[in-house]
Amino acid sequence: MSPASPMTPGLPYAPEIWIGVCTFRRPELEITLNSLARIDRAGATVGVVIADNDSTPSAQPLVERIAATFPMPLIYLHAPERNISIARNALLDHARRARARLLLSIDDDQWVGPDWLDQMLKPWREGQDGAPGSRIGAVLGPVHGVYQPGTPDWMARGRLHDTVPVRRRDGAIVSGYTGNTLLDLADPALSDLRFDVARGRSGGEDTAFFSAFLRAGGRIAFAPGAIVEETVPADRASLRWLLRRRYRMGQTHASLIARNRSRTGRLGQAGIAAAKAAACGGMALLGAGRPAWRNRQLMRAALHIGAGAYLAGAPRIELYGTPPVCAGSVQPDGQGGPKGPKGT
């Protein structure tokens, strides 16, 4: 990895790796930053950049206070407002201007272990061998939800808030997310790629981003040991929230497959989605006595309903950028953290 240049103004050196965090009214950001302060940098030059998506620079005092004693460069960016794609693009722009090689990202309610960076770098380094077209341009790590007391048993046992890559039968990763991600900014498939601002409130901007990356010939690897954890707040630990999220995911999927299709073609796909939703609903009825099974089938049904609704002309719902609900959090040592809003 070659040193990044030119240097970011005001820094004694130019980090070759930037870790980006988008934030929106979350005091849990302090937990995130405390965990990043403890990572093993393995000799790499690393910086952390925060993109605040609030209308006002509400996270700036927290970031500046922590920056005074942070063991690596910590930069604050104000990227208003209430549109997660704007914040994600601000991180991309910062890393590209600094001519950094790698941009990693985690969310502002997540924390990492000391070996997280090393675990993320391993598959990327291994993927640099071979012809340019076969090199790894992105790495995804797993996201594990940490449930609070009182979470329904079926939800906790099913690990329904965990995130891992979607794969084809041959093992190839076919989608991506931004909660635990590495991007090689030297990869041609990432050249000038940006997050869709039109999806910045509904969600799905990460799915669309990685879909474009894959269409451009990009390749994604998985880092199973690069685990990040996040608290599942009470307002998200419900079947209603899971169904709403799956509905939105269905809308995102449909918006991608609807490209270049005629209205007749879209309506045909909507009919297929409706049939799949009905089948999932029937399976949910058959498993009425088994909550975990039933609710998984309902989530699958919601996915297909969302796809069908979008293909039939329904508008996308908004999940992000709205006033959040307060929820407790769990710190990396397992102790209760500060209570604060959940936003993006």
Task: Indicate residue ranges for each PLM-predicted region.
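Acidic donor-binding loop at a coil-to-helix junction in glycosyltransferase catalytic cores
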Residues: G200-S211
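A conserved acidic beta->alpha catalytic loop
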Residues: D52-L62, Q110
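Short, flexible, basic/aromatic active-site loop/helix in glycosyltransferases
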Residues: G141-P142, A156-V174
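Non-catalytic, C-terminal membrane-associated alpha-helical segments of glycosyltransferases
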Residues: R244-R248, S262-T344
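Conserved donor NDP-sugar-binding/catalytic core segment of glycosyltransferases
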Residues: D115-D153
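Short, well-formed alpha-helical segments that are part of the catalytic scaffolds
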Residues: R25-I39
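Short beta-strand-to-loop acidic/aromatic patch adjacent to the donor-nucleotide binding site
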Residues: R99-W111
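Glycine-rich, basic loop-to-helix element that forms the pyrophosphate-binding segment
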Residues: A79-A98
